[in-house]
Every structure is written in structure tokens, then in C-alpha cells.
Amino acid sequence: VFLAVALNKVTSYYTHTAHAPVKSLTKACTTGHATNIIEGIALGYESTVAAIVVIGGAILLSVLTYAGTPPMFIAYGVAMAGIGMLTLTGNTISMDVFGPVADNANGIGEMGYDPEAMEAARPGSYRRARQILADLDAVGNTTKAETKGIAIGSAVIAAVSLFSSFIAVIAVGSEDRIGMMTVEQY
């Protein structure tokens, strides 16, 4: 659960319009194409490193929690970290749906508004409505990115768990003898 929350925070930092990475990318966009590409690639690499550190920390924490036990218990602990992430599936799916809903609201707003009629009725209302829809779209994009981070994080944890099981079977020769495996064999 802590891994999912940490991945949400990291992803939000790198994708939300209020934080420094997006602001620096916006500034790079104003200076030219080359700086925009360089800044975008640099931010992509930086955000990847942050996510890897968070996922690696979660795996290390689960390994340290089961330290001193047989290797299969350690692998079980890593698998439980993945199960803990999947307990938030309902939240993740509802956050994932918010992005397309915000996009649809923006599209309906673009098709349904008559700028001249709105400005005649209430001056400045069209500009405010467009800004609200743009903000809603930005939040939708951020939540979509956060859910992708959770999906990737749980996939990494599952892959580590499956790989450790594969190594265990290869090391002892059969599934029946995994319980007798020692750390040296692993």
C-alpha cells in the first residue's frame, strides 16, 4: 500500500502543472525545439530513476522484513508487497477513468459553447469556462499518469516474484524440494 502511495506522489510531482518539472518543461518550450527535447528527455530519465528507487526500496523493505527466514519466505514477502498494491485496485480504476471523463467534458464544452453569446450575456465567462476545462484536463492527465505508475509498479513486483520462483525451481531441481532450499542454493 505504501508503494502505491509513494508511486502516486512521485508521479504527481513529475506530471502535475504546479510542480517544478512541468514548469521547467514549459519554460524550455518557449526557448526552442532543441531545449524542449533535451529537457523532456532529461525529465523522463529523472522520473524513471525516482520510480525505480521507490520500487527498489519497497522490494528491499520486504526482503529485510523477512531476513533470516528461508528464501521462499523472502520471495513470499516480495509477492505480498505486490498484493498490497493490488488492494487499491478500485481506487486505481476510478482514477484511471477520470482522465477520459475530463477529456469528454472538454470536448463537449468546445462543441457546446458559443463564445459570442456567452460574452454578450456575461463578459469574461467564456474565458473562465475554457480555463476551468483546461485545468480539468490537466488533472485528468495527471491522474492517468499516476495509474500507469501503479500498474507498472505492480508488474515489476510480480515479475520479481515470478523470477525468484523460477530461480528457486532451477536451483533445487524440482518444486517439491523448494521448502528445503537454503540461502546458499538461492
What are these model-predicted stretches?
Residues 1-186:
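Hydrophobic packing and interface segments
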